[in-house]
Amino acid sequence: MASKNREIIKLKSTESSEMYWTVKNKKKTSGRLELKKYDRKLRKHVIFKEAK
């Protein structure tokens, strides 16, 4: 599983209810993660933001 420095996070789409699960390094990335990924419901690339 993930090590001590890594945290499992949820990425939520800004335009739909689609979600991705990923891990991030807490030491290197202190702020909230924001990635552009493919949304399967909308069938296009949108911004996904870190959600708790």
UniProtKB/Swiss-Prot annotation:
<dbReference type="InterPro" id="IPR001705">
    <property type="entry name" value="Ribosomal_bL33"/>
</dbReference>
<dbReference type="InterPro" id="IPR018264">
    <property type="entry name" value="Ribosomal_bL33_CS"/>
</dbReference>
<dbReference type="GO" id="GO:0006412">
    <property type="term" value="P:translation"/>
</dbReference>
<dbReference type="GO" id="GO:0003735">
    <property type="term" value="F:structural constituent of ribosome"/>
</dbReference>
<dbReference type="GO" id="GO:0022625">
    <property type="term" value="C:cytosolic large ribosomal subunit"/>
</dbReference>
<protein>
    <recommendedName>
        <fullName>Large ribosomal subunit protein bL33</fullName>
    </recommendedName>
</protein>
<dbReference type="Pfam" id="PF00471">
    <property type="entry name" value="Ribosomal_L33"/>
</dbReference>
<keyword id="KW-0687">Ribonucleoprotein</keyword>
<comment type="similarity">
    <text>Belongs to the bacterial ribosomal protein bL33 family.</text>
</comment>
<dbReference type="InterPro" id="IPR011332">
    <property type="entry name" value="Ribosomal_zn-bd"/>
</dbReference>
<dbReference type="InterPro" id="IPR038584">
    <property type="entry name" value="Ribosomal_bL33_sf"/>
</dbReference>
<keyword id="KW-0689">Ribosomal protein</keyword>
